[in-house]
Each structure stands twice: as structure tokens, then as C-alpha cells.
Swiss-Prot record:
Belongs to the universal ribosomal protein uL6 family. SUPFAM superfamilies: Ribosomal protein L6. This protein binds to the 23S rRNA, and is important in its secondary structure. It is located near the subunit interface in the base of the L7/L12 stalk, and near the tRNA binding site of the peptidyltransferase center. One of its GO terms (biological process) is cytoplasmic translation. InterPro entries: Ribosomal_uL6-like (IPR000702), Ribosomal_uL6-like_a/b-dom_sf (IPR036789), Ribosomal_uL6_a/b-dom (IPR020040), Ribosomal_uL6_bac-type (IPR019906), Ribosomal_uL6_CS (IPR002358). Part of the 50S ribosomal subunit. This is Large ribosomal subunit protein uL6. One of its GO terms (molecular function) is structural constituent of ribosome. Gene3D superfamilies: Ribosomal protein L6, alpha-beta domain (3.90.930.12).
Amino acid sequence: MSRIGKNPVPVPDKVTVSLDGLTVKVKGPKGELERTLPEGVSVSQEANTIVVAPTSTKRISRERHGLSRTLVANMIEGVHNGYSKALEIVGVGSRAQVKGTTLVVSAGYSHPVEMPAPAGITFKVENNTRVIVSGIDKELVGNEAAKVRAIRPPEPYKGKGIKYEGEHILRKAGKSGKK
């Protein structure tokens, strides 16, 4: 049995969960999420907790047990508190701004790069160099933050580029030159 999967998921007071087979709908103060869990697990609601259990002892069922429990926990956390990921823009002349729901990044290219926000995601910019991606779906927030970082990944010599807040960039020494 999965060590993560065997723990029940607590449901806060302001969150409602409805189950329909393997489809889980979670509604909370920040919004509503729906997801179909993979085959091989069963989901049940007991009092203020959600319990995920494997349907058999097959390997695939045991593998999906912990995954399914974490997916449900992330959905509940998302509609209750939400998720956010911060990125820092390092480099002279590199900056970001928000126009409507579109993030516009000037990252050293000949043109500014525009990223429209998908449904459920909001971009916020502080001091022109700090971008905050927020939303209720953890997977979507992480994917959009990765797309922003991919515009100009940090380079190892001077560290210029877009990096996650708190990310450590491995630095390389430059050429040593002739002596």
C-alpha cells in the first residue's frame, strides 16, 4: 500500500466535494475543478475526508494509488487557497508587463514576447522584473510558469534570463585566456 495514498485527504469547511465514479468535482471559494482519476483506484467520501484506495493488488493499481490521492489533495488545496509560482527576470533591459490578460516580456530579443493567459491563470508583475503566475490548478500554474521561463532560460556564465524565485543557477567560469 502506498504510504502517501493511505492517508485520507481532509476537506476544509468551505469546500464541497462530489464524486461520480472516478470523476471528482471540487468546489470552493476560489473556484471549481473537475478531474477524472485513472483506472485502478476507488474514491469514497467519509465525513470530512476523502479516501482513495486501490481496487486490486496489481502493480499499476498500486502505482496510481498515491498519484490519485495527491491529485485530489491538490484540487482541494487549489480551490481553498490557490497556487502561485514566482519568477525573476535577470539582465539589463529585460522586463515584463501585463496588458489585459497578456504577459509581455522583453527578454533581449528583437521583439517583445507575448503570452496570453489561459483560462484559470492570472499573471501579475512587480517591479518589472518579478512575474507571479497564479491560479487554482497546480498543474496548469506549473506549466505556464515553465513556459514563461522557457522564453529566456538562465544562462550559466552571467546568470541572465528568467528563473524561478529561489532557483540556484550553476555558474561556469569563462575562458581563461592566454598567458
